[in-house]
Amino acid sequence: MRKERVSEYLAERRTLRLALLALILLTAILSLVSYFTPLGARYWNYKAIKRIEAMGIKAPFTFAVFGDNKNSSRVFKGLLRRVAADREILFAMDLGDLVYDGDKEKFRYFLNQIKGFPKPLLTAIGNHELREEGRALYYRLFGPYYYSFTVGNSYFIVLDDANEAGLEPWEWDWLRKELEKAQAYRHRFIFFHVPLYDPRNPGQGNLESKIVIALGKKMFAHCLKDRRQADKLAKLFARYHVTHIFASHIHAYYTGRWDGVPFTITGGAGAELVGNDPEHDFYHYLKVHVGRERVKVELVKLPTPPYHWGIRLLEAAWVYLRSFMVIHWLNLILFILIVGLLVDLHRFWKKR
């Protein structure tokens, strides 16, 4: 009886229904092929450092810093285009939250975004890379979680504090040795994802901001959870005369000093903007101008949605929806085709 029903179903509107089944099969095959295709990149940061070394850079020079693109499509693409076109910028540093989570396809999408970027691009690991199997995948693609390199008169140290607690004991030992070596250089730059402290004051702002704060006070503890570790790191950086600290994690722009050491939080590379403060909550990246004696950090703003909390919430929802559609477009097509088939089957059975 079932075979008869299937034959009867295919007999009606035969061409259309066979085409639908063929499309479902083809889309499923393409989706599987895409998923099992190797990502290609291996030890990305090591290769980027080698490219920088081959350039023989001397001071003065300029590099870019940004963070929290988190699978953003439109904003991050525009950011990369501007950085690539800027002749002053020789290389770039992405401070983490490269992806929304550790899903393989989200890493594939990020790699597709940066594979055509003409300048060396280095990364730090963010907390979103730790989700699912992301930590192991990050290591295979980008290499060690913390590392160092030199450019001209400057020493660059990239740390892993993505667990939001602090550094592991072996990373502490490594950091102290690196800071000792860095004393031979004029400038010492530190990069990590999670800031030592959250510079935002939840008691300030307009009524809209206070409502958002009341609904989610955790947002204002977007820093290392272990205050002792944060204090210890701040004192260590001050003791070794660090020139500048760069962090992200907070989707905004902040600058100031931790134990006398200048810091900049730059989390405006495309992830959702929660706040609506015109002085801080906008898309942006940094240009860091390194001279023989001085360092200047220049803020470069990008097109940003209006500063209204309702529009910001809609924009945040659209950022996630757009990224999901771009990354999982094959699966979405497959889902729509299957739904169409089920609706057609339901109508056919209902007529009988």
Model-assigned labels for residue ranges:
Residues 1-18, 351-352:
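N-terminal Lys/Arg-rich, disordered targeting/topogenic segments
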Residues 19-34, 335-338:
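Hydrophobic membrane-insertion alpha-helices, especially the h-region
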Residues 28-109, 199:
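N-terminal active-site segment of His-dependent metallophosphoesterases
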Residues 35, 192-205:
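Short, solvent-exposed beta-strand-terminating loops
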Residues 40-48, 254-259, 279, 286-352:
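A short C-terminal boundary segment appended to hydrolase-like catalytic domains
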Residues 40-46, 51, 55, 104-188, ...:
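Extended active-site neighborhood of metal-dependent phosphoesterases/phosphodiesterases
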Residues 63, 92, 156, 188-189:
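Hydrophobic beta-strand anchors of alpha/beta hydrolase catalytic cores
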Residues 68, 96-97, 126-127, 193, ...:
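Active-site glycine-centered loops adjacent to acidic/histidine catalytic or metal-binding residues
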